[in-house]
């Protein structure tokens, strides 16, 4: 007969034992690497096209200068990684679906940049409309991720809110580009 959790004096949040500092640091590093790998892969399709077709594209009047995108995305990717790590640390019952939602949004994030920047020269405006569909799906996926993260770690959920705000803003830029190019 197995003793009950209460009899073992284990934390009620699902953790059997806390992770060691070394394991926590390694997993945080892994989340950061994954996040910045997505950023780096997206950057490959951006580099040539920001100074190519996008330089002469009709951009939204509220579009920020190109130099601002790098620092904003760097902060957002770091926040995403820390949020995922905070959820992972909890070992809560819904950690697996929460991190699955995180992986889905990261995949959609990875898809958007090459579609928007990389496919435009080949597909024209159709690439921009496809990118808009991806970013709308991305906003939905991040919203689902926040809904999973929040109950596990309030801080993790809050860390993703600026990401959603930026994605909504970016979707308006994408929409403008699709309509006007």
Spans of model-derived segments:
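Membrane-interface helix-boundary motifs at transmembrane edges
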Residues: 18-22, 88-97, 148-156
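Juxtamembrane boundary at the C-terminal end of a transmembrane helix
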Residues: 171-181
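Membrane-helix boundary connector in multi-pass membrane proteins
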Residues: 121-125, 143-157
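N-terminal membrane topogenic signal
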Residues: 16-31
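Helix-adjacent hinge/juxtasegments
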Residues: 78-114
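Perimembrane loop-to-helix junctions flanking transmembrane segments
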Residues: 51-64
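Alpha-helical transmembrane segments of multi-pass membrane proteins
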Residues: 34-51
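Membrane-interface loop-to-helix entry segments
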Residues: 63-78, 124-140
